[in-house]
Amino acid sequence: MRALGLDLGTKTLGVAISLSGIWANPYKTIFYDGTSYEPLIKELKTIITQNNIDTLVLGLPKNMDNSLGFAAERSLKFKNALEENFNLEVVLID
């Protein structure tokens, strides 16, 4: 498994790569304006192609009571954008 770990913030996307499926190493931070995912998708296309990625792992930050707040809703919207642009499995993890 070659996976990208994604941590979506309000202005940045943290990216880590796992080439073994066991360990992940920091790769880069991508900056965006917080309103459009297009710059992120464009950059991710390059990273995915260059590293033969087959799985995307996206952080889903839940509240302490396991409910979904604003940050989780933002992650779910980004998950939809990833699924629309890539034919890859997108796994959510808290």
Residue ranges and their predicted role:
Residues 2-3, 11-94:
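Phosphate- and other anionic-substrate recognition elements at nucleic-acid/protein interfaces
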